[in-house]
Amino acid sequence: MTDRSFLDWPFFEPAHRELALSLDAWATENLCDIDDSDVDAACRELVRRLAAGGWLDYCVPAAFGGAREKLDVRSLCLIREILARHSGLADFAFAMQGLGSGPITLKGSDAIRRDYLPAVRRGQKIAAFALSEPEAGSDVAALAATARRDGKD
């Protein structure tokens, strides 16, 4: 990483600076030999490597083996920025683990959290966030569907 001046921005803590430098060094060593001719296989391999490197620990809270007590947006942004500089596919693989685990962390039942979050962190399950609606596609902010309770269930 040639320009590190952004790490001096006031909203980054020393731990964020250490994270950025450590990930950049790791990515230089671990992302240079990914064969992306088979994108699905490459993504699975990237998730495996990200888990082995401890980077997926940032996708889940500490209660499920994660790096921090709560998900930290600054850490997630730094990780994505650095991974994207090294490999767009590595950024994609990391982003999907985070996008899929975020809603489970925030609103999942205890049983779902116990089942999925540790496995996502270890790279044993590939997380996803999927939705679609006519006129909105995958734009969450444009969703128009509503729900209303009908009965006691």
Give the label of every model feature segment.
Residues 1-18:
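Intrinsic disorder at enzyme termini
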Residues 12, 39-43, 112-113:
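Residue-level recognition of alpha-helical structural elements
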Residues 13, 36-37, 69, 106:
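Hydrophobic alpha-helical scaffolding
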Residues 19-23:
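Extended amphipathic alpha-helical segments enriched in small hydrophobics
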Residues 28-54, 64-68:
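Short secondary-structure junction/hinge motifs that connect adjacent elements
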Residues 66-69, 111-153:
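Glycine-rich, Trp-frequent "lid" loop and neighboring beta-strands that shape
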